[in-house]
Amino acid sequence: MPVTDRSVPSLLQERADQQPDSTAYTYIDYGSDPKGFADSLTWSQVYSRACIIAEELKLCGLPGDRVAVLAPQGLEYVLAFLGALQAGFIAVPLSTPQYGIHDDRVSAVLQDSKPVAILTTSSVVGDVTKYAASHDGQPAPVVVEVDLLDLDSPRQMPAFSRQHTGAAYLQYTSGSTRTPAGVIVSHTNVIANVTQSMYGYFGDPAKIPTGTVVSWLPLYHDMGLILGICAPLVARRRAVLMSPMSFLRRPARWMQLLATSGRCFSAAPNFAFELAVRRTSDQDMAGLDLRDVVGIVSGSERIHVATVRRFIERFAPYNLSPTAIRPSYGLAEATLYVAAPEAGAAPKTVRFDYEQLTAGQARPCGTDGSVGTELISYGSPDPSSVRIVNPETMVENPPGVVGEIWVHGDHVTMGYWQKPKQTAQVFDAKLVDPAPAAPEGPWLRTGDLGVISDGELFIMGRIKDLLIVDGRNHYPDDIEATIQEITGGRAAAIAVPDDITEQLVAIIEFKRRGSTAEEVMLKLRSVKREVTSAISKSHSLRVADLVLVSPGSIPITTSGKIRRSACVERYRSDGFKRLDVAV
């Protein structure tokens, strides 16, 4: 598919022309009906309503201006996003502000992007209007309630330009290691990345299955936006959507939708696979079959090998194929998708020598009983688009040497909104002494540590999250995975400096269990002993402090990533309310 002369609006018009009566998006509302109330739109309805919203927006500004979308999960969010693009504006997808709580992130993004309009719905307009303030002398954005527009009125569709070669939307990063920045995603980026991912997941274009996209992911998040709105449009698929809250309240709903949507494709972070295993009963799955699930992407956060195994084992009796589970690596700066294992392959893991890994060398464990770290493979990426580079020298690393993952291609986005210096540092990297087949640049510096071993990509974590304890490098994701296998809850491994060096501290969310205070204390002591022993055995590390806290205490981003720097600050200021204070 040529991507240089296509845009999201042109594809939407094409779908409306070629498949006017085919269902495009279905939203299942479990809030109004516990059994799920389904509401659907055809491609012609989506196109006509997006055009009406675009007409309304043209009264607010000019193409290239920003339009924020602050609406609940649902069809109105889909229409608002596509309407902004239809008018040639730059969409800014955001979450709805929490009721009764000032949302600093929403305020910061609106101040940075300076939208001329905010698209919302009547159900939340009271909360949204509070954020419609003027910034730097510019007029306050116009608030448009999408559901109150006459979206069904028959009218001649206006002639919009089919060429939208510039920015489509700003995807604000979750800010796990820095202040959120707006990633500028172009129409070309979207179409290229969806196309790349389809080829990556299914190989031969002729083998790309028709079917349905199933998603509960928030539409303001990069994976939810691409999966729930853009992929159905680019890949000619129907989408079945529900809200994140509907999933969290009853994870079995996700599995039931997968079993009843025919040939379908979905995606979720690691924690969702764990929730589905723990909270989907045999009764929930009675009479259901998952044999038609062609793919479930696991991405957006560190993938735990044990979780993948539990998920496959839990749903094997319902004919879920192991090859349907697709571990994937990506980031917003590359639109979404970067790498995944080859089509038809079940998830593969390799156990690497831990001591060598802390020294930056990836050597598979032998049979000598050495302590190993099990990592999941992300397949064999195209060398022209993915390289492992020494972040200090900018020279490509040989296979087996850990370095920074660099990415190149049409899916690499345009940079950070209004941040030229940061854009140059991250998006315009050049290889020193590149190999004959490698382009010199520009390369995207992902900030992620990875390695190519036996031709396959393995990922360790973020460079900025690297723990240096006793003069050795340690990967917090590995330590957290060890803890979570014991406690089952969220954990944060952080390095806290003392007068001489840095010490390992683990913050562990734990649900108090026990009918008496004495039983609770005994359980907490037992957990601390077990975690301390496991970290010592698996990582050759001494834990300076284990902090047991209630669920929800660890700071996270809007996409669920641990804010480790915030954990350090909170720990040093005694900001965590410890369950183990008397242990």
From Swiss-Prot:
SUPFAM superfamilies: Acetyl-CoA synthetase-like (SSF56801)
GO BP terms: Actinobacterium-type cell wall biogenesis; fatty acid biosynthetic process; lipid biosynthetic process
Gene3D superfamilies: 3.30.300.30, N-terminal domain of ligase-like
GO CC annotations, alphabetized: plasma membrane
Known EC number: 6.2.1.59
Keywords for the protein's UniProt record, in alphabetical order: Fatty acid metabolism, Ligase, Lipid metabolism
GO molecular function, one term: adenylyltransferase activity
CDD domains registered for this protein in UniProt: FAAL
Catalytic activity: holo-[(phenol)carboxyphthiodiolenone synthase] + a long-chain fatty acid + ATP = a long-chain fatty acyl-[(phenol)carboxyphthiodiolenone synthase] + AMP + diphosphate; eicosanoate + holo-[(phenol)carboxyphthiodiolenone synthase] + ATP = icosanoyl-[(phenol)carboxyphthiodiolenone synthase] + AMP + diphosphate; holo-[(phenol)carboxyphthiodiolenone synthase] + docosanoate + ATP = docosanoyl-[(phenol)carboxyphthiodiolenone synthase] + AMP + diphosphate
A matching Pfam family: AMP-binding
Disruption phenotype: Disruption of the gene abolishes the production of phthiocerol dimycocerosate (DIM A) and of phthiodiolone dimycocerosate (DIM B). Mutant can still produce mycoside B.
Family: Belongs to the ATP-dependent AMP-binding enzyme family.
Classification via NCBIfam families: PRK05850.1 (NF004509)
Role this protein plays: Catalyzes the activation of long-chain fatty acids as acyl-adenylates (acyl-AMP), which are then transferred to the multifunctional polyketide synthase PpsA for further chain extension. Catalyzes the adenylation of the long-chain fatty acids eicosanoate (C20) or docosanoate (C22), and potentially the very-long-chain fatty acid lignocerate (C24). Involved in the biosynthesis of phthiocerol dimycocerosate (DIM A) and phthiodiolone dimycocerosate (DIM B).
Protein's UniProt name: Long-chain-fatty-acid--AMP ligase FadD26
Originating organism: Mycobacterium bovis (strain ATCC BAA-935 / AF2122/97)
Gene assigned in the entry: fadD26
